[in-house]
């Protein structure tokens, strides 16, 4: 049986600094927190120029509905989705940054809730997905920027705006979606005209799924990044 209370052996970047440490790295971590929290602050408010400032040229974004795309394409797709009625917002709940001693590479994890409003057959409801963003940051010259942004999708649920009206759900079709973002994937496919990826990183408890494998892989990639290696984007 999988140990549900531990992370994969050897996945912790032991040489990285994540709290305390020298004051110069505290300042760098504050900069990285501001960048990470810029994702929900900027994207949800359509502040696209500010959103672009999070990334380095050539950076990629990897989400359930977009797949792996250059960040500029993600912005274009986000705008198009909004114009078609997609209403996605985020709530942030804290950050933690691992940074190398040189202050040139970092991984910031941002706990958040993705909340998407849907309207189906006259019923308004939100799907809320607990997740963690994973930002792969690099300092080029004097400027920090993300080279890759991914997520762990941990659990989700449906919340009716009006408890008296709730949409019908095809239980058999629902079973075909991953446990960490089952309702999000179901309704994104049903309403957005997209094919949602089913193998996104999940939670440690998603035993026997590709989502657990990708959960562990993302931790290993974070360690590789902090140790100066190149990762497969």
Swiss-Prot record:
Source taxon at top rank: Eukaryota
InterPro entries found in the cross-reference section: NTF2-like_dom_sf (IPR032710), SnoaL-like (IPR037401)
Task of the protein: May contribute to the ability of the fungus to cause disease on pea plants.
Family: Belongs to the PEP2 family.
Name by which UniProt lists this protein: PEP2-like protein NECHADRAFT_97050
């Amino acid at each position: 049986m999988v140990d549900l209370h531990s992370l994969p052996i050897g996945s912790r970047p032991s040489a990285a600094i994540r709290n305390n440490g020298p004051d110069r790295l505290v300042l760098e971590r504050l900069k990285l927190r501001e960048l990470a929290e810029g994702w929900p602050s900027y994207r949800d408010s359509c502040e696209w120029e500010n959103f672009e400032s999070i990334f380095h040229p050539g950076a990629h974004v990897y989400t359930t509905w977009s797949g792996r795309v250059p960040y500029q394409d993600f912005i274009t797709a986000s705008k198009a989705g909004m114009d078609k009625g997609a209403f996605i917002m985020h709530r942030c709940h804290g950050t933690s940054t691992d940074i190398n001693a040189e202050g040139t590479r970092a991984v910031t994890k941002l706990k958040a809730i993705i909340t998407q409003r849907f309207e189906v057959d006259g019923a308004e409801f939100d799907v809320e997905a607990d997740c963690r963003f994973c930002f792969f940051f690099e300092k080029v010259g004097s400027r920090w920027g993300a080279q890759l942004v991914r997520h762990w999708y941990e659990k989700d649920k449906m919340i009716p705006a009006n408890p008296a009206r709730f949409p019908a759900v095809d239980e058999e079709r629902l079973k075909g979606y991953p446990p960490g973002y089952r309702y999000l994937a179901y309704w994104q496919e049903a309403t957005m005209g997209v094919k949602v990826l089913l193998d996104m990183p999940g939670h440690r408890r998603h035993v026997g799924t590709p989502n657990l494998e990708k959960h562990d892989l993302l931790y290993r990639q974070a360690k590789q990044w902090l140790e100066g290696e190149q990762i497969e984007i």
